[in-house]
Amino acid sequence: MILIIGGAFQGKLAYALKAYNLTENDVCDLAVSDPEPGYKCYRHLEALSRRNNDITRLLPLFEDAVVIARQVNGGIVPMDGAERAWRERYGIILQQLAKKSEHVTRVFCGIAEELK
C-alpha cells in the first residue's frame, strides 16, 4: 500500500497520477461512491470515513493500492463533540494505514515529502 496525505487542494491526486503512472480510470473517488475492488487508487478516504464509522473492515481492499487521504490534524479543534470524535477515529485509521504502507508521502503546495 502507498499512502498519500495532505491538505485540501494541495496536489495529492496530480502527484499520485504522475508518480505511479495512473490514469483517471484507475481512481475510485470515495466522495461519490463506495470502494470497489480492482482500482489502483482510492481518493477521498475522509469522505468514506464520514459515511461509515467502521471502515477498518475495508482496509484489506487498499492493500495493493495508492490511497489518497486528506490531512485534518491541523487548524482549529472543532467545538462540536461529534466532529472531534470523527477526527479521532479518522486519525486512528490513518495511523493504521501508515503502519501497513510501504510508502507514506505528504504533499504540500504540490511538493511531495517522503515520510516513510
Please give the residue ranges for each predicted region.
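Active-site donor-binding loop signature of nucleotide-sugar glycosyltransferases
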Residues: 6, 44, 109
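Sequence-level detector for tyrosine residue identity
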Residues: 15, 20, 39-42, 90
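Conserved nucleotide-sensing/catalytic segment adjacent to the nucleotide-binding pocket
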Residues: 25-69
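Glycine-rich P-loop/Walker A and Walker A-like loops and their local beta1-loop-alpha1 context
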Residues: 1-31
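Glycine-rich nucleotide phosphate-binding loop and flanking beta-alpha elements
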Residues: 10-11, 48-49, 112
